[in-house]
Amino acid sequence: DEIIAIGATRIVGRRLMTRERLELLVRPEREVSADSVAVHRLRAQDVADGLPLCEAMERLLMFIGSRPLVGYYLEFDVAMIDRALKRCFGLTLPQQKIEVSAMYYDWRFRQLPPYQQHDNADIDLRFSTILQTLDLPMRDAHDALNDAVMAALAFIRLRELRGEAEVAS
């Protein structure tokens, strides 16, 4: 797998700053696989004029700064980014990682009746379910910026539902 698209947006307080976003296409070093085209809907010609990987990573680092990362199933994305950063600059992301699915699980778990609160609680963690339960709009999935926006909206809503006054930016 290669990084072919990067999407990020900023959260300030309880607001999603959609004007402050990063949306990049990355020129892959290998052919874009049919599986990748099917998932991300980006063809070889769509990313042919993308940035070289190391330039895209530099822009991502500048955009992120020291802020925490918020996302849905971040482990995969962070592993891909860390691999690219290690190759380009010899470093990995030190930022705090905030996993939206874990926040959602904790929130839903507390809503279960006591007899259902056990280690194997049946809580649906699909992104579409999370967004629907939180009454948030579902945008086209597997689009880097859309995924970032939806994860940010879920993060903000979950923080509000948990009664947390300030949201990390």
Predicted segments — roles?
Residues L53-G65:
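Short, basic/hydrophobic alpha-helical segments
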Residues A38-A56:
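Metal-dependent phosphoesterase signature
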Residues E2-I4, R10-H40, M62-S169:
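Metal-dependent phosphoesterase core characteristic of DEDDh/y 3'-5' exonuclease domains
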